[in-house]
Amino acid sequence: MPKQHKLTPLEETLEAWRGAREGVIEEAENVPASKYGFRPTPRSRTVAELLRHILEVGMMAAGELSRKDTDLHRAPWPELLALYTAPLAKATNRAAILRLLRSSIGDAQRKLRRPASGR
């Protein structure tokens, strides 16, 4: 007999997202601050750029999915990201990026748990 899930699909998604974020944080903590500017190839992102990219996509997803009028095509991708990524302006070093990785997942979960009528 299949195992019954006690979580709603939303809660399962948020739990998986938190687990994935915790893994990213653990890996980011393993990288010394002096290596956050490391770029493996000229066409690659630095460690800091990659982590900031993870943050910006998460912020945009939470922002758009918590809107009453969600529409991922309402603006070109860079413009859509810019609507939600103001907190990234201050995340320019390892400590700030790690703080934002830790705090933004909770912010996203709170947004997505709000009833649709409160969005």
Please tell me what each predicted stretch does.
Residues V47:
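Helix-turn-helix
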Residues A33-S34, R114:
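Short, well-ordered coil loops that connect the C-terminus of an alpha-helix to the N-terminus
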Residues L14-A33:
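Mature N-terminal segment immediately following signal peptide/propeptide cleavage
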Residues H53:
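Histidine-centered divalent metal-coordination motifs
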Residues M1-T13, E56-R119:
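Short, helix-capping/interhelical loops that line the mouth of catalytic, cofactor-
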Residues Y36-R39:
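Surface-exposed patches in mature extracellular/periplasmic domains of secreted proteins
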Residues R43:
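Conserved functional hotspot residues or short segments at active or partner-binding sites
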